[in-house]
């Protein structure tokens, strides 16, 4: 029976060492290193995932804005016929450009600030 106790004690001593001056239990350094490395890997993966999602969101927003601009440009050019341009020139005004129509459309569609309410 004492052999079994010695066996248990020796296996415990192999896995964990005690500092005789403090009498505290210390974990082997390799275990601590693995835990710290695992935490770094998880943080790195999380950071990488967030960066990927932000990049995807940015590209998607650019694509949407491009499509909205094209749609607004197409709608504006349909309304802005050659007869309209002739009338504007006859009235000594500058002809409408599709860019100004797109810009006006985009700003009209933007949500208004709540500070003014």
From Swiss-Prot:
One annotated GO biological process: heterochromatin formation
InterPro entries the UniProt entry points to: Histone-fold
Region entry Disordered, spans: 1-30, 71-117
A cellular component annotation (GO) from this entry: nucleosome
Taxonomic superkingdom: Eukaryota
Biased composition (Basic and acidic residues): 82-117
GO molecular function: protein heterodimerization activity; structural constituent of chromatin
Stretches with biased composition (Polar residues): 72-81
Subunit and partners: May interact with the N-terminus of HD.
Protein name: Huntingtin-interacting protein M
Organism this protein belongs to: Homo sapiens
Organismal lineage: Eukaryota, Metazoa, Chordata, Craniata, Vertebrata
